Amino acid sequence: MEEKTAARRLTRRNSLYEKHPNSVDSLGRAGYRFSTQVMLKFSRLSMGLTAGLLLAGLNTVSAAKNVDAADPKKVDADFKFQGEYAGSLGGQYDVGAQVIALGGGKFKMILYPGGLPGAGYEGEEKREYDGARDGDTVTFTGGTTGKSISGGKLTFERDGQSFSIDRTIRKSPTLSAKPPEGATVLFNGKSAKNFKPGKMTEDGLLMEGANSVAKFQSHKLHLEFRLPYEPTRRGQGRANSGCYLQARYEVQVLDSFGLAGKHNECGGIYSIKDPDLNMCFPPLQWQTYDIDFTAAKYDKDGKKTANARITVRHNGVLIHDNVELPKRTTASPLAEGPEPGFLHLQDHSNPLRFRNIWVVKK
């Protein structure tokens, strides 16, 4: 990592960050400054398991639906350790970490040079470490640097010196966005009448497995969703759903927090394109999709003359920019055609929750 690049990163201000209320910013007091040379050595510490092994370990599908997984009040002792951590190493170099709960006190940590995805990370090589919980501390193995989480802080120790970064809760800049004048409000927490089928929880959230009554051609969509906390599930069995534009083109919904970011993971256009960046937040944290969809065009005989196109922002970050959709995506309810289609929120045997859904026709 070059010093100029590091300096630029240090000046960045990420508007998504909100410090965890129990975290303590000890970086300024540590007085420990890492040189570029030391940081290069740090970035080349033991890699732990590879991304391929991580994906292999997270690819088992479990079918039974656990409704309690959608309830933030019914989490296990591991939940408070899962999440994002971000800060500066010795006041010079930004770093981010995503900690994934795997059940039974086991964890995976992904370490990002430069900061978290969408907040400083620019595609450099990531590092992965396995961790285990003992009481109120999670300790990670691998490399010559000690790594542990306690009290809302991720601490690194090496050669008798240490530094810490804080647990960070990010919020999408479009979270709770109000529908503009003229928008079609599909769900505002008062009733599920605009969806057939459509079910609402007692606390006013839309459940998975919903089809909008209204149908649309070209439009802009704002949608907020929350993944359930399912640490023992893996791959496509972990918080799986989908947001289908016109019931034809799916933007995948999945707990792929910390994973590579593939077409069948959160933000992916299923079977067509990976997201440019994996912006998936941790389970039980509200997320946003802001989608600009242009419907396919057909002539008077029903022959397609132009493919549909889509632009997607996930948690405020552009992940698809005017992408052409040459076909309908896998498992879409409707075939391609000139007719308008409905918004389909897939039921894939996981308890997803949705809120604040509205559409602006183009």
Model-derived segments and spans:
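Positively charged n-region of N-terminal signal peptides that target proteins for export
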Residues: 18, 39-44
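Bacterial N-terminal signal peptides
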Residues: 46-57
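N-terminal secretory signal peptides
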Residues: 67-90, 95-98
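Sec/Tat signal peptide C-region and signal peptidase I cleavage site
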Residues: 59-63
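Short, positively charged and aromatic/hydrophobic N-terminal segments
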Residues: 13, 18, 25-26, 32-35
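Extreme N-terminal basic, low-complexity initiation segments
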Residues: 2-8
